[in-house]
């Protein structure tokens, strides 16, 4: 029997990126996974043509031994989110895990190159639309998904909510300005505080709320950016990790009977890899990304 067989998960933002890796790892562990996000085979695609759909991810979840259920959901539209969780309740009768990896930061730019060229400029020389893209398809998306998930979990007296973040350093795990992206930093700081406060209110109901800090992930968009050896060297691509690494961290948390002890904290994926004994897709242990420590 697989460790998460019979468990029900919703992964928000899993057509690509960290969310896709999380969905696949949950599938490896045997979970029923609602693969959700804005990009489906039938429907609009991102402006920068980033690959991936909820349908593709769901099919791979099933192929890996779980059950993938694709649902197109725009997490900036509350009615769509409410309908998703009502469907989960109707079809499964419970929800064990919510993993949120929604991120609309790329929506403010016409292409991957445009995003990279904007990085490092002062905020007044970057598109003001970033605020809406990153705060709405970011902090609000995490809130509204958690809102409906927590209702189901509180009624059951248990559950796990996981979020993905960026912009923390060192053992103190305190938010710090990353340099070159004011709205990016603000959006992630908002997510961090949101998750910490949700943890306080969720703990009496045995709902663990945990934030994960990955290293430099090989997402589809990152791979679109890394076009030259010079750029790979600049970003220390040799220290990057697949999105399955953070996925295995979520699967480990979901299988941990003492997970409530970790609630309200930001955890490095690398630390959980040590604790739970998992590696990246290629068998390597990837340490905490040194660029995070040096910022």
Task: Cite the ranges covered by each PLM segment.
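Conserved Rossmann-fold SDR core element
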Residues: 26, 94, 158-161, 192-219, ...
């Amino acid at each position: 029997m697989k460790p998460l067989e019979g468990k029900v998960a919703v992964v928000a933002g899993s057509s690509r990126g960290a969310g896709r890796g999380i969905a696949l790892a949950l599938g490896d562990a045997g979970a029923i996974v609602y693969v959700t996000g804005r990009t489906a085979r039938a429907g609009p695609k991102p402006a920068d043509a980033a690959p991936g759909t909820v349908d593709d991810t769901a099919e791979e979840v099933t192929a890996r031994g779980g059950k993938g259920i694709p649902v197109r959901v725009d997490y900036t539209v509350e009615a769509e989110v409410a309908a998703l969780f009502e469907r989960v309740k109707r079809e499964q009768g419970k929800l064990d895990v919510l993993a949120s990896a929604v991120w609309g930061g790329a929506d403010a730019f016409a292409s991957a190159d445009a995003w990279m060229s904007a990085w490092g400029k002062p905020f007044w020389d970057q598109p003001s639309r970033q605020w809406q893209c990153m705060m709405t398809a970011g902090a609000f998306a995490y809130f509204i998904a958690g809102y409906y998930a927590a209702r189901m979990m509180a009624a059951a007296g248990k559950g796990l909510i996981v979020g993905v973040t960026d912009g923390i350093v060192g053992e103190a795990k305190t938010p710090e300005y990353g340099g070159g992206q004011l709205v990016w930093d603000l959006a992630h700081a908002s997510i961090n505080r949101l998750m910490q406060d949700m943890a306080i209110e969720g703990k009496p109901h045995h709902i663990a709320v945990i934030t994960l800090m990955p290293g430099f992930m090989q997402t589809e968009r990152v791979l679109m950016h890394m076009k030259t050896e010079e750029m790979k060297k600049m970003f220390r691509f040799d220290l990057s990790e697949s999105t399955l690494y953070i996925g295995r961290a979520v699967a480990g948390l979901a299988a941990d009977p003492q997970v409530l002890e970790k609630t309200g904290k930001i955890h490095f994926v690398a630390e959980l890899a040590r604790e739970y004994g998992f590696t990246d897709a290629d068998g390597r242990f990837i340490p905490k990304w040194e660029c995070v420590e040096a910022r």
